[in-house]
């Protein structure tokens, strides 16, 4: 007798460095709790981010910029991801890194503009007329073929639809008959037909026929309520970049050039300003008609000091345009030379005229107690058991070195504990692992001591 275990089909997600962040962890009045939603400490920065989230939701923040500034390992990226979690899936959030703009195929400013457009959403409301019901009759009407010969062509289709409220007989175009055949529609099926496009969708078999057969692979659906002819409101969320790409590369042309273009490897081409201007006009027309509404999202630029002076100059114009998202910069630099210049130093590697336009949120270094809490949260996320002694020791290591280094020691220490036959990480496992792997500071110290032994 063979017994098989049923494996779960739910997707297992890889645990990333910020998997534990679920939100900003604020209470109803907007004040930060000491530890909530995966974030610990940084109360002032979290409250400031909470204010920004409220401004974004009320659509009063578009075209502004925020800078998250602080030393490495103080949770700048985590704060940006927490903002994305708070806003939800309906608001577009586009993360990018400063070094992404450098490409051999397209200009730096084009990459920036693409990401700007990705961060602006458009919610389109569409009212569709739909005929929905159970098929009571399906009769194709034939006529003599006008081209001559013995064949006959279908002139129209008579279809009867029934709902709980009543029945209707429709006379449909012969092109819809092909769709009905593709969907394998027969009497007793529940279908809906879109009046504008003529699209046919078979939803399933009506549940009054459920007892006909013992074995049936059909999906049974109830008889639709209401009238046969209905009006449905459908809401679609797209970004402006989706519209740009759809119009820059139209698909499905019948001429030889289109065919060749589809076969050849598509080269990344720039989308012209003229095309974007045309799309903006159409979008503005939709907004004026009340068909669509603009949803300004968030563009998150990590390592913003990697951008050069041309990109910063372009950002000035982009931030002041009529359609602009909220831009969040993050930088861990102090005073440094602006990329693309010889000797102009500036705070965070950002020119002073752009710094003047951004609201700056500072992130502070974590205290040893906060570090311990973060390591504990990480251990829970990764499903690792850790003793109190080992946790204290990791907290001390984090204070001396960096938080990232102490978090990275968790998994190897867990592996060592398993080899030793222990369920949880003890202090001696952490000590052994920290001797095996160096942190950045101790590695740099060894380099300084043994400088003459290394190649220049």
Swiss-Prot record:
Enzyme class, first EC level, given as a word: hydrolase
Principal subcellular localization: nucleus
A Pfam family this chain is assigned to: TIP49
GO cellular component: centrosome; dynein axonemal particle; Ino80 complex; MLL1 complex; NuA4 histone acetyltransferase complex; nuclear matrix; nuclear membrane; nucleosome
InterPro entries (alphabetical): AAA+_ATPase, P-loop_NTPase, RuvB-like, RuvB-like_C, RuvBL1/2_DNA/RNA_bd_dom, TIP49_P-loop
EC number: 3.6.4.12
Signal sequence bounds: none
Transmembrane segments annotated in the record for this chain: none
Localization of this protein: Nucleus membrane; Nucleus, Nucleoplasm; Cytoplasm; Membrane
Cross-link (Glycyl lysine isopeptide (Lys-Gly) (interchain with G-Cter in SUMO2)): 2, 225, 445
SMART domains referenced in this protein's UniProt entry, alphabetically: AAA (SM00382)
Keywords: Acetylation, Activator, ATP-binding, Cell cycle, Cell division, Chromatin regulator, Cytoplasm, Cytoskeleton, DNA damage, DNA recombination, DNA repair, Growth regulation, Helicase, Hydrolase, Isopeptide bond, Membrane, Mitosis, Nucleotide-binding, Nucleus, Transcription, Transcription regulation, Ubl conjugation
A GO BP annotation: DNA recombination
Residues bearing the modification N6-acetyllysine: 453
Superkingdom: Eukaryota
Residues given in the record as ATP binding sites: 70-77
UniProt note on tissues of expression: Abundantly expressed in testes and moderately in spleen, thymus, and lung. In mouse seminiferous tubules, is specifically localized in germ cells from late pachytene spermatocytes to round spermatids.
Catalytic activity: ATP + H2O = ADP + phosphate + H(+)
Subunit record text: Forms homohexameric rings. Can form a dodecamer with RUVBL2 made of two stacked hexameric rings; however, even though RUVBL1 and RUVBL2 are present in equimolar ratio, the oligomeric status of each hexamer is not known. Oligomerization may regulate binding to nucleic acids and conversely, binding to nucleic acids may affect the dodecameric assembly. Interaction of the complex with DHX34 results in conformational changes of the N-terminus of the RUVBL2 subunits, resulting in loss of nucleotide binding ability and ATP hydrolysis of the complex.
Function: Possesses single-stranded DNA-stimulated ATPase and ATP-dependent DNA helicase (3' to 5') activity; hexamerization is thought to be critical for ATP hydrolysis and adjacent subunits in the ring-like structure contribute to the ATPase activity. Component of the NuA4 histone acetyltransferase complex which is involved in transcriptional activation of select genes principally by acetylation of nucleosomal histones H4 and H2A. This modification may both alter nucleosome-DNA interactions and promote interaction of the modified histones with other proteins which positively regulate transcription.
Protein name: RuvB-like 1
Gene name as annotated: Ruvbl1
């Amino acid at each position: 007798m063979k017994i098989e275990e049923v494996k779960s089909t739910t997707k297992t997600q890889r645990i990333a460095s910020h998997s534990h962040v679920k939100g900003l962890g604020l209470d109803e009045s907007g004040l930060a709790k000491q530890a909530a939603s995966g974030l610990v400490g940084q109360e002032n920065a979290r409250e400031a981010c909470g204010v920004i989230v409220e401004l974004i939701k009320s659509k009063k923040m578009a075209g502004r910029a925020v800078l998250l500034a602080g030393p490495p390992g103080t949770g700048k990226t985590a704060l940006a991801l927490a903002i994305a979690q708070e806003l939800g899936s309906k608001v577009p959030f586009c993360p990018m890194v400063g070094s992404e703009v450098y490409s051999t195929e397209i200009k730096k400013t084009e990459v920036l503009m693409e990401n700007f457009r990705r961060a602006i959403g458009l919610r389109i409301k569409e009212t569709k007329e739909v005929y929905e019901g159970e098929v009571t009759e399906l009769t194709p009407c034939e006529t003599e073929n006008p081209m001559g010969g013995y064949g006959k062509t279908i002139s129209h289709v008579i279809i009867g639809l029934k709902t709980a409220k009543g029945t209707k007989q429709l006379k449909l175009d012969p092109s819809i008959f092909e769709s009905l055949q593709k969907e394998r529609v027969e009497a007793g099926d529940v279908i809906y037909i879109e009046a504008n496009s003529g699209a046919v969708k078979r939803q399933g078999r009506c549940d009054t026929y459920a007892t006909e057969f013992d074995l049936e692979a059909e999906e049974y659906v109830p008889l639709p309520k209401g009238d046969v002819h209905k009006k449905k409101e459908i809401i679609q969320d797209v970004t402006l970049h989706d519209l740009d790409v759809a119009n820059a590369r139209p698909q499905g042309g019948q001429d030889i050039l289109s065919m060749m273009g589809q076969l050849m490897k598509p080269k990344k081409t720039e989308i012209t300003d003229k095309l974007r201007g045309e799309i903006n006009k159409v979008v503005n027309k939709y907004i004026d008609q009340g068909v669509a509404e603009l949803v300004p999202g968030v563009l998150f630029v990590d390592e913003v000091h990697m951008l050069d002076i041309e990109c910063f100059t372009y950002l000035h114009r982009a931030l002041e345009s009529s359609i602009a998202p909220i831009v969040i910069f993050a930088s861990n630099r102090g005073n440094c030379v602006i990329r693309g210049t010889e000797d102009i130093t500036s705070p965070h590697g950002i020119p002073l005229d752009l710094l003047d336009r951004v609201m700056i949120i500072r992130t502070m270094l974590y205290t040893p107690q906060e570090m311990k809490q973060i390591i504990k949260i990480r251990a829970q996320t990764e499903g690792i058991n850790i003793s109190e002694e080992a946790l204290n020791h990791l907290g001390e290591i984090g204070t001396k070195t960096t938080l990232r280094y102490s978090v990275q020691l968790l998994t190897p220490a867990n592996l060592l504990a398993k080899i030793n036959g222990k369920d949880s990480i003890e202090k001696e496992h952490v000590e052994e692992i920290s001797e095996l792997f160096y942190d950045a500071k101790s590695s740099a110290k060894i380099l300084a001591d043994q400088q003459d032994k290394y190649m220049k």
